[in-house]
Amino acid sequence: MGAMIVREVFEIAEKIKNMEIRGAGEIARAVAEALKIQAEKSKAKTSHELWKELKEASKILYNTRPTAVSLPNALRYVMYRGKIAYTSNADLESLRYTIINAAKEFIYNSEKAIERIGEIGAKRIEDGDVIMTHCHSKAAISVMKTAFDQGKDIKVIVTETRPRWQGKITAKELASYGIPVIYIVDGAARHYMKMTDKVVMGADSITANGAVINQIGTALIALTAKEHRVWVMIAAETYKFHPETMLGQLVEIEMRDPTEVVPKEELETWPKNIEVLNPAFDVTPPEYIDVIITEKGVIPPYAAIDILKEEFGWAFKYREPWED
């Protein structure tokens, strides 16, 4: 008999897949929550059955979005703690408690991290700064909002972020805090870089050499900023750092549906020899980045490897906890 997976796990997996739940932090908290619900609602009679269900649930969640490293890192955080309990012969209720607790702890820490990044990053923002941002990053917004709440006079240039327009979400959110916003098309980033003092963006993943994987368009903005000698700050929680890259694995860049770029009805009328490509992310090399702001402090990109060793060093002694 197969493992009994609760409905909520499938619902959360589906929402991550179709981007109803989006943004690395939101995705990470959602998968931790899914494991918590699986543990709470499980009808398992033994710790062996519950562990089997948790592994199955983890696999379902793991396969939803290939690039967002926050997703496997959240699963690792919860499941490694579960694995230690399970392999030390924990009984059913102890294992359940371990998983629920680890999930709550992960969610709490990840919310606190955003606040802390705001406090640390705001120190780098000066009164009168014009800041450019791209896509929608809770960590980047936290830096700008904290600086504004400290009474610094800032203005933010927001790129629309095609094809899914995450810039609209960012622009409205910043404006709701009272921050003056300029909203521009992605192609205008270089034109407005001359009036920009700092670039503050988030990250989906950060590799061992300090390269940043983020929403498509991030690398172009960072390149333009470097050309104009404008400071580039990446705001990211430590669970965005990608442990597998220490072992030389390359990050897979997710390709999304062409109909996000050209509506289906229109695409069907196009000549067949036009191929529409829609990569979700690009890679910004570390030399285009001045600092990475984490909840543990400000680091230069080349120190990413130190964060990885500190946070995930243990991960290399084992296989993934949901693998057999």
Curated annotation (Swiss-Prot):
The active site is at residues 135, 204. One of its GO terms (biological process) is L-methionine salvage from methylthioadenosine. Substrate binds at residues 22-25, 65, 137-139, 240. GO terms for molecular function: ribose 1,5-bisphosphate isomerase activity; S-methyl-5-thioribose-1-phosphate isomerase activity. InterPro entries: IF-2B-related (IPR000649), IF_2B-like_C (IPR042529), Initiation_fac_2B_a/b/d (IPR011559), M1Pi_N (IPR027363), NagB/RpiA_transferase-like (IPR037171), R15Pi (IPR005250). Keywords: Carbohydrate metabolism, Isomerase. Its EC number is 5.3.1.29. The keyword Isomerase applies. Gene3D superfamilies: translation initiation factor eif-2b, domain 1, Translation initiation factor eif-2b, domain 2. It catalyses: alpha-D-ribose 1,5-bisphosphate = D-ribulose 1,5-bisphosphate. It comes from the Archaea. Catalyzes the isomerization of ribose 1,5-bisphosphate (R15P) to ribulose 1,5-bisphosphate (RuBP), the CO(2) acceptor and substrate for RubisCO. Functions in an archaeal AMP degradation pathway, together with AMP phosphorylase and RubisCO. HAMAP family: R15P_isomerase. Belongs to the eIF-2B alpha/beta/delta subunits family. R15P isomerase subfamily. This is Ribose 1,5-bisphosphate isomerase. It comes from Pyrococcus furiosus (strain ATCC 43587 / DSM 3638 / JCM 8422 / Vc1).
